[in-house]
């Protein structure tokens, strides 16, 4: 918990070196709807999003309908990543959120908007800018993750590929989804980003909508502050696909269509604590400390 408090203190420093600009994208005023996806699928994705936080146990562990197939990293030099085969979501890659590692924290505060690295540039339209630290974190794992995904697709004869993650891992999940959607013959199947910070500019948000819209969802728990950073006034913009759990850590969830929906999570001020950040998403408690290891699916009672 202390390292996240430290991170929260560093964010104002990062903001000081970024030039304010006009809001770079639309604000949706569409009314919320029921979920466009079965909540059991969200629960399965949340369980796999939590599993990289687990330090012990690994290959062969079961998380709901999925089995851990491969793991790399310890959250110190690179973010931990795990690959599963899930009966409902196919070959699934899950990225770890922020850890106590200085390098992990530096990924979070390296908040410049940069051009996509040349290796992933073909996945994006012109004008896209990415959060530098999140992009760097993904690039450190990109090639090996791709090799493992292709191997497991063949092993299980399963073309479906899903990405997921929490916090920093959620940002990596959407970057992976865009990259893999270009690299894989059949694109991606689904992408779920829990507690995702804003990861790029308006062109990025539009590109996500265009290329993986309807397959990408980001989930906000209550007044979690992480999805509110960095501010839109600094050129950052969420894509469409918001599912808002409100009140937090309950089964009261709705889908908020369009980008930065006026009636969604932006309608309430963030709470600068970690209760909602480390909250319960679709019956799964996510994050270091409160989350169960190994991860489980659908085991937390919700009001």
UniProtKB/Swiss-Prot annotation:
Localization (cell): Secreted
Any single biological process term in GO: lipid catabolic process
Keywords: Disulfide bond, Hydrolase, Lipid degradation, Lipid metabolism, Metal-binding, Secreted, Signal
EC number: 3.1.1.-
GO cellular component, one term: extracellular region
Disulfide bonds: 54-293
Coiled coil: none
Assigned protein family: Belongs to the AB hydrolase superfamily. Lipase family. Class 3 subfamily.
Listed name of the protein: Secreted mono- and diacylglycerol lipase LIP4
